[in-house]
Amino acid sequence: MGQRFLTLYSKFFQKFLKSKKPPRLAGQWSRLARPLKVVFDCSNGVAGLVLKQLKTGEIKTYFINEKPDGNFPAHGPNPLNPGATNQLQAAVKKNKADLGIIFDADADRMFCIDDKSRFINPDAIARILAWQLKPKKIIIDVSTGWLVKKLQVTSYKLQVIESKVGHYFIKKMMRAENADFGAEQSGHYYFKNFFGLDSGILAAIEVINAVSELPYKLSDFIELLPKYYHQEINIRYQESGIRNQEIFKKIEKKYLLLNTKYLIRISHLDGLTMEFENKIGPASRSLGEGWWFNLRFSQTESLLRLNIETTEKSKFQKEVSKLKKFLQLAAR
C-alpha cells in the first residue's frame, strides 16, 4: 500500500473521530466524553497500517498482531475461528481496557470484546451503532436478531428493512432505500457516509465514540439489553442429505401443521423464515416475544445455515433439537 494513499485513507477516517475541541484543533480522540483504553487486534492484516496513523490523543491504544503477514501466524485471518479472540481477551484483561476490537485480514469486518473480556454478539454491536448514529433507516440481513429488528417498535424512530444475506444484496438495498446504516451477523457494518459500503475501521471508530459517551461501562450496556438466545448453526450437506430447496417446503409444512395458531409471519426472502409467539396469548406479539428461525443455503460453502432465536434458554435448546429432527426427516 503506497504511503500517499495510506495517508489520505487515514485522513478520511480521522474526521469521524469525535472531538469537543475547537474546529482548528479537532481530529483527535483526546476530547471524547471520557478517556478510554482500547486494544486492537489487527490479525496480521491491514487494519494496523491505518489505525496507527490516526491521532489518538489521550485515548490509550494497545496493538497486537498489527504487522501485516500473509501467513497470519497469530490466529488466522478470521476472527470467528475458534480461539481467534483469545489473545485479545487476555490483552483486555491485562491492560484493564474498556474495549477490545479485532479485525479480519482486510478490515471490512470487526468484532468487539467488552471490559470484562467477553465476546459481544454482532447484534449488540449493531444496537450500539444504532444508538450512536441515530439512523432513520437500517438494512439488516435475515439472520439478524431481535436486538436490531425490534428497534423500530421500541425506543428508536427508525425503519428496519430486511435483505438477503451477502455483500451484494446489502449494498444494493443500502442504495435503493437510501439507508443510513446496515448490519450483518457476520460482522459487516455499512455506512451511508462511506459510500454505502462496509468498513470495519469506521465501525470501530463509531463504537469507540459510542462507548466514550456511555454513562457506564460497555459491559453494563450489554447487560442492560433485552436477553435473547440467538445462534447460527451450520449443517453440512453430506451430514444431512440435504440437496435442494424442497427441504424448506417440507419444514414449512411441518410447522404449519403444528403451530398455525401461534404463527406471526412467514418469509421466503432468503430461504425460509418463520416466527411464532409464545403460547401465552396475543399480548406477546407486539413485543416480538416467542421465537423464530431462518433456514438458508450458504452462498459460499456446502452448508445449510440455521439461525434461531428465543426469549428463553430452555426454549432455545428445545426448538434446536426439534428443528434438527425435522431436518433429518425432511432430508430422506
Locate each region found by the language model.
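Glycine-biased, low-complexity coil/linker segments
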Residues: L25-A26, I280-E289
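Phosphate-binding and adjacent anionic-ligand microenvironments
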Residues: P135-L151, L158-K279, G290-R332
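Buried hydrophobic packing segments
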Residues: L51, L88, L129-L133, A204-V211
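Gly/Ser/Thr-rich loops at beta-strand to alpha-helix junctions
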Residues: S43-G48, A107-D108, T144-W146, E312
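Gly/Ser/Thr-enriched, mixed-charge loops and adjacent short helices
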Residues: M1-K21, L32-N95
